[in-house]
Amino acid sequence: MLVYSHRPEVREAVVTAVGRRPAPDLGRIRYVEASGVAEVLAACDAGEVDLAILDGEAQPTGGMGLARQLKDEITDCPPIVVSVRRADDRWLATWSRADAVLVHPLDPLTAAETVADVLRGLGSTAPATS
């Protein structure tokens, strides 16, 4: 799972909230952190991402614009979860074609459940237990 933000504390908050195993029926998650757009694009282009969580407030390129770009440009785009600072910004995440939205401050139960729901939607391509 790829976590993108230019701020390390945001990446850490996401990893901590979602946890290593968001649900008992899912395998352990291996996180890859990205602080720049080039890292996200390279990982997605290489097919190395099962799910991406993008910081909607990242700079200079925000997660919402990046989500829309990925959905438009990558044939088999992985599911994308966008995190936003304000609940009122959920509509922007919908515009970005994100598969789900997380709102800061992150609630660990909600974050884990949201990610688990998206991973379950992958069916047989969900990450394996490691």
Residue positions per predicted region:
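Conserved acidic segment of CheY-like receiver
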Residues: 1-19, 52
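C-terminal output helix
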Residues: 13, 106-115
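Short hydrophobic/Thr-rich beta-strand motif most characteristic of the beta2 strand and flanking loop
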Residues: 26-35
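Two-component signal transduction core modules
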Residues: 52, 101-102
